[in-house]
Amino acid sequence: MNTTFSITPLGDNAVMIEWEQRIDPNIHQQVMKAFHYLQSLKLSYITDLIPAYASLAVLYDAAGIRQKIKRPARAWISAFITRTLQQTPDTVATASRSLQIPVCYHPSLAPDLSAMAQQKGISETDLITLHTAQTYTVYMLGFLPGFPYIGKVDDQLASPRLKQPRTQVPAGSVGIAGEQTGIYPLSSPGGWNIIGQTPIRLFDPAAKDPCYCRPGDQVQFVPVTLETFYQMQQPS
């Protein structure tokens, strides 16, 4: 795999592996290869792995490393990661899933759809077509539990955040900010351009796997009617 990365401290019990800092599916593929390979080793010293756009946070048991390996924890884990990733084969599976997420683009659920279409000089139908035409990658989860950062949208859809964020955005709202699209798993304040809403519950703390989306997932948005939306809607 691509060994052009750096490792920097992230507090007392973590380090950050960083690749070139930009939104790029090839770079994210390297992140996910590192994530899955380190995860497959099932080392007790590594307590968590958190992938993002172009980085991977590695949380580790510093006390356990010092006690059992008799070496400074950060130096040992950094050397271990460097050595391991340099030897990681390019054939490592990234175990991505394909998800079809229903979205209703009805005006009652899409407060920014009309204004955004006017700003872009296209019809609302064309905007919806552009948003649903491609398969996206979930690059990371963040901001809220289970909030998927998904990209990249068609250049015609790229839009800045709202100048005045809303104090409340409903759970399931689908938005666009910059080159990204995302889904609010919970009701919260937010400044993304809301163009629709999904009936799917994206975060369930009582579930075995609380987050509906995972980094590396391949996502396609499927338009549904308002009637279908309410038939499918799951309690949040």
Task: List the predicted regions and their residue ranges.
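Glycine-rich active-site loops that engage anionic ligands at enzyme catalytic sites
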Residues: N2-S236
